[in-house]
């Protein structure tokens, strides 16, 4: 059975989006598939390309042939280079400007800021707890003094 990795078209007439699928080469474009391994939204800016790298590597390894369009997507994500053993396996996939957290440095800074905020919160909570315990001790000792005074 000849297996292809190709695009399955979904969406409206002028607003297409695609699923990256593994299918028998003899089936229809939007027909029965063996497995869906990703999605591609070309109308967004930048285009959304989400391919399960592990599954793509598996299907390429067992002999599935990508179409020209899917081959271009695999090159962008770096899966084709990884499969062929070529340099550049990290790919050239762009991310939105708002997704700055995707960079490792920004993510580390964000985690450090959250941890610092958590430490401040813990410190305030422990100070409140200590103050409450101290006031309870004072109230308890005052009550004990009153009890001793009333016994006499």
UniProtKB/Swiss-Prot annotation:
Protein name listed in UniProt: Small ribosomal subunit protein bS16
PROSITE patterns according to UniProt: RIBOSOMAL_S16
GO molecular function terms noted in the UniProt entry: structural constituent of ribosome
GO biological process: translation
Gene3D superfamilies, sorted: 3.30.1320.10
InterPro entries assigned: Ribosomal_bS16, Ribosomal_bS16_CS, Ribosomal_bS16_dom_sf
Gene Ontology CC entries for this record: cytoplasm; small ribosomal subunit
Compositional bias (Low complexity): 131-144
A Pfam family assignment: Ribosomal_S16
UniProt family annotation: Belongs to the bacterial ribosomal protein bS16 family.
Keywords from the UniProt entry: Ribonucleoprotein, Ribosomal protein
Region called Disordered, residue ranges: 118-152
Gene responsible for this protein: rpsP
The keyword Cytoplasm is annotated on this UniProt entry: no
Start-end of Basic and acidic residues biased regions: 118-130
């Amino acid at each position: 059975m000849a297996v292809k990795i190709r695009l399955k078209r979904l969406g409206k007439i002028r607003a297409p989006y695609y699923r990256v699928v593994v299918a028998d080469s003899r089936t229809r474009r939007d027909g029965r598939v063996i497995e869906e391994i990703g999605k591609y939204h070309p109308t967004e800016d930048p285009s959304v390309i989400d391919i399960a790298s592990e599954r793509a590597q598996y299907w390429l390894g067992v002999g599935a042939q990508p179409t020209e369009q899917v081959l271009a997507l695999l090159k962008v994500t770096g899966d084709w280079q990884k499969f062929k053993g070529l340099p550049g396996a990290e790919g050239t996939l762009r991310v939105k400007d708002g997704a700055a957290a995707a960079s490792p440095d920004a993510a580390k800074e964000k985690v450090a800021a959250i941890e610092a905020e958590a430490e401040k919160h813990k410190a305030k909570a422990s100070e409140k707890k200590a103050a409450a315990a101290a006031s309870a001790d004072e109230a308890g000792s005052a009550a004990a003094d009153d009890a001793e005074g009333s016994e006499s």
